[in-house]
């Protein structure tokens, strides 16, 4: 029984890889995504094959490749988008282009891009809300501070009110 949707009969063997190797890679790729991109599944063998698919030829080592593409939802989204945009060059007798096309179909079918768009947007929202909370804690007065400002004992005892300064808009002079 196969460990994923791909069977060796769906792929053409190359000089250096069997059809079973291609099916195993495709299934490992999908398992890697479904696992939540677990680093333990990003083995040297898997990295060596993945780094030669979907145009990923400029990465020099496994840790750099992993940190570039799989450490945040935004990075994972970029990875999936690149995989879908890749034109799958080559002949299946010499490359993994048949596996790339099959993976593109499966990525679309499983709706990974939309899922990671939502996850990436939520990560941005969470980060922005944390910043907002920090800024509000620093700059927004608390209800007790607001109450103290309304009934200031110094101004209420003297009967005078504080001077209010108006903020003027800056005027740009000529630079020449």
Summary of predicted features, one role per range:
Residues 22-26, 73-77, 125-128:
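Short amphipathic alpha-helical segments that mediate assembly, nucleic-acid/protein binding
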Residues 103-142:
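Charge-rich, low-complexity alpha-helical coiled-coil segments
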Residues 149-176:
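Charge-dense, low-complexity intrinsically disordered regions
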Residues 36-108, 156:
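Acidic, low-complexity, intrinsically disordered interaction modules
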Residues 143-147:
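Short, charge-rich amphipathic alpha-helical segments embedded
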Residues 32-35, 75, 159, 163-166:
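Intrinsically disordered, low-complexity serine/threonine-rich segments
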Residues 1-32, 174-176:
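Short, extreme N-terminal segment that most often corresponds to the first beta-strand
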């Amino acid at each position: 029984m196969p460990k994923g949707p791909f069977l060796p009969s769906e792929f053409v063997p190359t000089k250096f890889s069997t059809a079973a190797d291609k099916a195993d890679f495709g299934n490992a790729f999908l398992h890697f995504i479904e696992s939540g991109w677990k680093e333990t599944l990003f083995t040297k063998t898997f990295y060596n094959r993945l780094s030669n698919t979907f145009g990923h030829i400029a990465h020099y080592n496994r840790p750099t490749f992993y940190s570039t593409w799989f450490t945040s939802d935004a990075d994972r989204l970029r990875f999936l988008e690149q995989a879908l945009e890749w034109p799958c060059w080559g002949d299946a007798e010499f490359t993994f282009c048949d596996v790339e096309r099959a993976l593109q179909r499966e990525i679309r079918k499983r709706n990974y891009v939309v899922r990671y768009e939502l996850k990436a947007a939520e990560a941005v929202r969470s980060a922005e809300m944390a910043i907002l909370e920090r800024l509000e804690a620093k700059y927004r007065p608390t209800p007790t501070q607001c109450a103290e400002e309304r009934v200031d004992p110094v101004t209420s005892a003297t009967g005078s009110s504080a001077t209010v300064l108006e903020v003027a808009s800056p005027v740009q002079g000529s630079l020449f």
